[in-house]
A protein has these predicted regions:
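Non-catalytic, conformational "gating/processing" segments within enzyme and secreted inhibitor domains
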Residues: 1-159, 176-264
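Composition- and surface-driven signal marking solvent-exposed, interaction-prone regions
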Residues: 99-101, 154-156, 163-171, 255-256, ...
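C-terminal soluble interaction/assembly domains
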Residues: 239, 245-298
Length: 298
């Protein structure tokens, strides 16, 4: 099989922890091997807490300590899982062609003074950055050394309205159409972290059958005649990103917890001084690795 892989500079990991006595189908194991997943047989029935601690440790190692405790310590409530499927991403990039320089504190979007950094490409030998500066939105593409990944900063004039109407197609158009030459960028240092269940979000997006013991169909994963059916009990997601004058470090992880059904249920100058959206994506394919927004960089 041939599946798309993360671009140069992005480290990805995939692992599946499967209940030791669960009759997993050969086709599913083949699929796991196809995507390069580590397959671990564990006994959730005997020591579910120990197994989940091991999973969290694996996630922490793969994200270089950026995502800790992906699956909460007080989980599960009730019946133990019979499979946990985890994927991780890690990125550590240095700015190119020049590092930013810290320039002190200034106002940001009405939240008060925050620490700013600046990049100037004034020399004729310096390559320019791409961007778009308009009354509605400011977009700039920031580059990293030795990687296919770029950071796109999107600062709309009306942040709330822009986010409420944002779609993948609208975002793709924003970061793909960059006609202006950018010779300087001033933006805040920022750090953002997220960790919680995304089950409600997925269900709001229409992913419902997989969470339903009555409707879930994982017959391609396990021999349901011998073992019974499975359903997804919860999905946990954790992400961390930090941007400073040296570059960007980011990590993310997603854990899918599966339970048995028998269980209970011109030279532009850009200043980023208002709330903005950030995207880490492959420059060629526009595959998005990290996306988020910053309202307060502190």
């Amino acid at each position: 099989c041939a599946l798309p892989r993360a671009g140069r500079g992005v480290e990805e990991g995939v692992a599946a922890w499967l209940q030791a006595d669960m009759p997993v189908t050969d086709s599913y194991l083949s699929r796991l091997r196809c995507i390069g997943a580590e397959v671990r047989k564990v006994d959730f029935k005997r020591d579910v807490k120990g197994a989940l601690r091991h999973i969290n440790k694996w996630v922490e190692e793969r994200t270089r300590g950026l995502v800790k405790g992906l699956i909460p310590e007080d989980y599960p409530v009730g019946w133990e899982p019979h499979a946990v499927l985890v994927s991780t991403l890690f990125f550590n990039g240095s700015w190119w062609p020049e590092r930013f320089v810290r320039v002190g504190k200034a106002e940001f979007g009405g939240v008060g003074p925050v620490e700013y950094m600046s990049l100037s490409l004034g020399s004729c030998s310096d390559p320019s950055l791409r961007g778009r500066v308009s009354d509605d939105v400011v977009v700039v593409e920031l580059l990293f050394r030795d990687t296919d990944v770029a950071m796109y900063i999107v600062m709309p004039a009306d942040f709330r309205r822009y986010v409420e109407t944002l779609t993948y197609e609208k975002l793709l158009d924003a970061v793909s159409t960059l006609p202006d030459e950018v010779v300087s960028v001033k933006m805040p240092l920022f750090k953002a972290e997220f960790k919680q269940s995304i089950k409600p979000l997925l269900m709001d997006m229409g992913v419902t059958d997989a969470f339903s013991p009555e409707k879930a169909d994982f017959s391609q994963m396990v021999d349901v005649k011998k073992y019974g059916g499975l359903y997804i009990d919860d999905v946990f997601h954790g992400a961390f990103i930090k941007a400073d004058e040296n570059g960007v470090v980011a990590g993310a992880a997603t854990g899918v917890v599966v339970k048995p059904i028998c269980a209970k249920t011109g030279g532009r100058h850009v200043v980023i001084d208002k709330p903005f959206i950030f995207v880490l994506a492959d420059r060629s394919t526009k595959t998005i690795y990290f996306i988020g927004h910053v309202v307060d960089p502190r």
